[in-house]
Curated annotation (Swiss-Prot):
This is Meiosis expressed gene 1 protein homolog. One of its GO terms (biological process) is protein localization. It comes from Homo sapiens (Human). It comes from the Eukaryota. InterPro entries: Meiosis-expressed_gene_1 (IPR020186).
C-alpha cells in the first residue's frame, strides 16, 4: 500500500453508467471517495464483492455501521451525474 495520505489530483463527474461508476457510487454512498480511500481508512486489503458481478457487496462506514448492496445495479441513470471520479 502506498503512502497513507494519498490525495486526488483532480475530480470529474460521471457522464454515463459503467461497472466502474457502479462501484464508485457504492463507495461514495458509504462516505468514501473510492476504493483507495476505503482501503486506507479501514486498513483492509480486500473489499467484499459479489462473485457473479464484481460489484461491491458490503462496506463499513466510518461510524462502523455496514452498508449491504445487491448483486444488481443500484446506481440509477438519474444518479450517475452525482458520482465523482477522482484521478491520482
Amino acid at each position: 500500500m502506498a503512502s497513507s495520505d494519498v490525495k486526488p489530483k483532480s475530480v470529474s463527474h460521471a457522464k454515463k453508467w459503467s461497472e466502474e461508476i457502479e462501484n464508485l457510487y457504492r463507495f461514495q454512498q458509504a462516505g468514501y471517495r473510492d476504493e483507495t480511500e476505503y482501503r486506507q481508512v479501514k486498513q483492509v486489503s480486500m473489499v467484499d464483492r459479489w462473485p457473479e458481478t464484481g460489484y461491491v457487496k458490503k462496506l463499513q462506514r466510518r461510524d462502523n455501521t455496514f452498508y449491504y448492496y445487491n448483486k444488481q445495479r443500484e446506481c440509477d441513470d438519474k444518479e450517475v451525474h452525482k458520482v465523482k471520479i477522482y484521478a491520482y
